[in-house]
Amino acid sequence: FLVRGFQGEELSRAAVIATHDDTAKLILLARLSLYGHRAARLHDEVLELVAEWGPADPARRLRVLNATKTDMALADLETSLRERLPAVEESIQRQLRAQLPADVALLKDRLEALASERAERAKAQLGKRAEDEANAFVKVLREQRERILKTRTKHDSEFEQLAFGFADHELRQLRDNRSYWDRRLARIERDLELEPAAIRRTFEVATAPRIEPAGAIVLWPQQMSP
């Protein structure tokens, strides 16, 4: 899917930008999305895979960069855009774009591996968030239950002693309070049983990761030809 997507109009419109660096670089951009139940979008991120090659290398051997060098390449891209370097010669741009389908085919497995790695990392983060929120919910309900139980116990211990001194409407209010606490406790028990699983389900990835090509950028050293 990734290769098919990048071999369409995205590659014919790929940006070719001049750079101060002495190596050529290909930056592939893809969007990774994870969806939960009822098509709820849980995660979005842009993937960047960067490969470099020596402009004078006739074999055009692509070397995929590690995370640190990828960040440096992206910083180099920002610098080139900010400084508005002169445009790369049009004939060079055409040659570089013509080579992109083969480049993308070579990088397909690495891009898919990167997408799989990032998807698993995102799932782990979502799972941790689900546990944190479920545990926080349980903690709040248990604290509420404890306060209600203490209040109800105090009410019950005093009720019989004070009952004869209360008017009928006051006794009704006391009984209404007791009934409310009982209903609230029953609701808390029900929520403790059901809601943690519902919270976890909210953060559960329900479909295969969706990966969409987002663009391709070539950084080309100034004053060089392919």
Describe the residue ranges of each PLM region.
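Charged, non-catalytic accessory extensions
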Residues: 2-226
